[in-house]
Amino acid sequence: MICEELKSRKNFVEEDFIELRDSVEGLISVIEKYKDMRKDSDGYIRELKKFLEEVNLVLEEKNLTKKELTNLHSLSESYFDSRIDNSIYSYYVYDKNNLEKTHQANDEIGIAKKRFGKILYKITEKVMYHMI
């Protein structure tokens, strides 16, 4: 039922998931750009690439299962929970020898995280609306 309701909304997959894919790719790109400034960056990159594979699969199949839809909500919580040490919300870099580079990097990372969070929230908001 949820899938049918969401499918009936014009271009749910095409618009929102393309934007989600682009935001994940942008976040991966900016983390890779500054990964030398944080030792555990590769773990974040791996997790985001796994997520990107799932997003691409949804785009390729143009189909969302009920499980995928309900998992989006918990995914958004885990990515942006400030109490979780390895959440994307807590990701930042630091170079004690170059504070200007640190500020520039964290500004770029912050913009990419905000874009990713905004579209993920938009999608989960639609999912939660249809689950009520």
What annotation goes with each model-predicted range?
Residues V55-L75:
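Short, solvent-exposed, charged loop/turn and helix-capping segments
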Residues S8-F17, L69-Y79:
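Phosphate-binding glycine-rich loops and adjacent basic patches that engage nucleotide phosphates
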Residues V24, I28-I31, K49, N56, ...:
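Extended amphipathic alpha-helical scaffold segments
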